[in-house]
A protein has these predicted regions:
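Conserved, mostly hydrophobic/aromatic
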Residues: 46, 110, 273
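C-terminal accessory regions of radical SAM enzymes
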Residues: 296-366
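A short mid-domain helix/strand-loop element embedded in enzyme catalytic domains
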Residues: 103-115, 131, 136-141, 194
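Conserved AdoMet/S-adenosylmethionine-binding subsite of the radical SAM
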Residues: 131-139, 154-306
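Mobile, glycine- and charge-enriched loop segments
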Residues: 112, 141, 227-253, 333-336, ...
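Canonical Radical SAM [4Fe-4S] cluster-binding loop centered on the CxxxCxxC motif
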Residues: 92-127, 179
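Flexible, acidic/Gly-rich N-terminal and inter-domain linker regions that tether
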Residues: 1-93
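Conserved catalytic-core segments centered on acid/base and nucleophilic motifs
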Residues: 100-101, 112-113, 145-148, 152-154, ...
C-alpha cells in the first residue's frame, strides 16, 4: 500500500473506530459531540501502536477523541498567531523566522493540538499563494530561516513540496529551511516509500544551507522499526533532524518516560530541541496540561538520567510574547527567561513570578 492510499485509509469515523475498540452508546454519543466540532483522523499505522487492553495507553490518549474535549476552558489562539499573520498563511513573529501554514491536514489529528481551531476544518488561515509568501520573504532581508508547518507539510504531494523548495532556494539570505512534521511518528511510510521525496530533500540540503526536519515524538512507544528506517533514510539524504516534545498529562508526565524518550532520540540520531509546556488551548488544557511546578520537577529528575546530548533541549512556554524558558524554582518563585521574544527588547530578559501548585501558564502566575 502506498503512503497516499494509507493516508486516505485513515480512521475518521466512529464506525471505523469501532473496528478497533468497543464503544458504549454513551461513549458513541460523547464522541459524536466532539467530532461535530473537531474531526478525527488517525492513520491505521498509528492505531496499531495502541494497546487497547491498557485504558491509559499514551498513544490512545494522544490520538483518540474523548469526552474531555467538551471542556471549553482556555483559548483557541494562545500564541497570538492571528496578530503575527502578515499575509494569509504567513506568520512573522520573530524577526529572523517566518512560519508558513502550508496545510490544515495531518496524518493523525493530535487531540492536544495547539492549532485545534483549524486542523481538519475549513479555514482562511492556510497559505494559498506561495508566490506571495516568497515575495514577502524576499523583501525582508532580516529573515534567515523558514519553518514550513501546518498541519503537516509532509501530507502535501511531493510536487508541492518541490515548488516550495525551488522558490525558497532562490532567496539568498536564507540560511536553512525547516519542516515541522509528525509524519515520522504517525506515518513513516511517507518517507520510506517515496524515493522522489528523498532525492528532492537531498538535492536541496547543501553543505552551506541545510534542510531540517523538526519532528514531534512524545513517547518512546512512537519509535518503532519503521520509524528507525525513516530516520535512517533522512540522515543518509542529508536531512538534519531535531525534536520537539510536548509535556502531556497521562502521556509523558513522569521522569522515567521523559528520560527514556530523550535518550532514545539521541541514540537514533535525532537532536532534542524543545520540551513545550502544553498550551492552555480550549478543549485541551484541562485534559493535557501539567502544572508548571510539577513539570519542572519532572524535567529536572529526567535530566539526571540523561547524557549531555539528551538534555540539550529547553523547557519552554510558547507564549504570545515569545518562547519563555523555565529556568528554575526556588523559594516559591519560578525563574523565567525570554529565549525568543516578539519584542526584541525582551530577548534574554530574566524575570521571576510567584509559583503555586496549579499554575500552568504565565497568566496563572502572580
Amino acid at each position: 500500500m502506498g503512503w497516499q492510499k494509507e493516508l486516505r485509509n485513515s480512521v475518521s469515523t466512529i464506525e471505523e473506530l469501532k473496528e478497533y475498540v468497543k464503544l458504549s452508546a454513551k461513549e458513541e454519543t460523547e464522541l459524536g459531540s466532539v467530532l461535530k466540532v473537531h474531526p478525527m483522523r488517525v492513520s491505521r499505522y498509528y492505531l496499531s501502536l495502541i494497546d487497547w487492553n491498557n485504558p491509559n495507553d499514551p498513544i490512545k490518549k494522544m490520538a483518540i477523541p474523548s469526552k474531555e474535549e467538551l471542556d471549553l476552558t482556555g483559548l483557541y489562539d494562545t500564541s497570538g498567531e492571528h496578530e503575527n499573520t502578515k499575509i494569509k498563511g504567513v506568520q512573522h513573529k520573530y524577526s529572523r523566522t517566518v512560519l508558513l501554514l502550508s496545510t490544515n491536514n495531518c496524518a493523525t489529528y493530535c487531540r492536544y493540538c495547539f492549532r485545534k481551531r483549524l486542523i481538519g476544518l475549513p479555514t482562511e488561515e492556510i497559505l494559498h499563494r506561495f508566490n506571495s509568501a516568497a515575495k514577502y520573504i524576499q523583501n525582508h532581508k532580516e529573515i534567515n530561516n523558514i519553518l514550513i508547518s501546518g498541519g503537516d507539510p509532509l501530507t502535501l504531494p511531493t510536487k508541492t513540496i518541490e515548488k516550495f523548495l525551488t522558490q525558497l532556494s532562490q532567496i539568498k539570505h536564507l540560511d536553512f529551511i525547516r519542516f515541522g512534521t509528525k509524519i515520522l511518528a504517525a506515518l513513516p511510510s511517507r518517507i520510506t516509500e517515496d524515493k522522489n521525496l528523498l532525492r528532492l530533500l537531498e538535492s536541496n540540503s547543501h553543505t552551506d544551507r541545510r534542510i531540517f526536519f523538526v519532528t514531534q515524538f512524545n513517547h518512546p512507544n512512537e519509535i518503532t522499526d519503521k520509524t528507525l528506517a525513516a530516520v535512517d533514510l533522512l540522515l543518509k539524504h542529508k536531512v538534519i533532524i531535531s525534536n520537539q516534545t510536548v509535556l502531556l498529562k497521562g502521556v509523558n508526565d513522569d521522569y522515567e518516560t521523559m528520560a527514556a524518550l530523550q535518550n532514545k532520540l539521541v541514540s537514533i540520531g535525532i537532536n532534542p530541541y524543545y520540551i513545550f509546556q502544553c498550551r492552555p488551548v480550549k478543549r485541551v488544557k484541562n485534559n493535557f496540561q501539567v502544572p508548571l511546578y510539577k513539570g519542572y520537577e519532572i524535567i529536572e529528575a529526567a535530566k539526571k538520567e540523561m547524557s549531555g546530548h539528551g538534555k540539550r533541549f529547553r523547557y519552554v512556554m510558547s507564549h504570545n510574547t515569545g518562547k519563555i524558558e523555565i529556568l528554575g524554582i526556588m523559594d516559591n518563585y519560578i525563574y523565567l527567561k525570554y529565549h525568543q521574544a516578539r519584542n526584541e527588547k525582551d530577548l534574554g530578559k530574566i524575570f521571576k513570578k510567584k509559583i503555586n501548585q496549579t499554575a500552568g501558564w504565565l497568566e496563572d502566575l502572580e
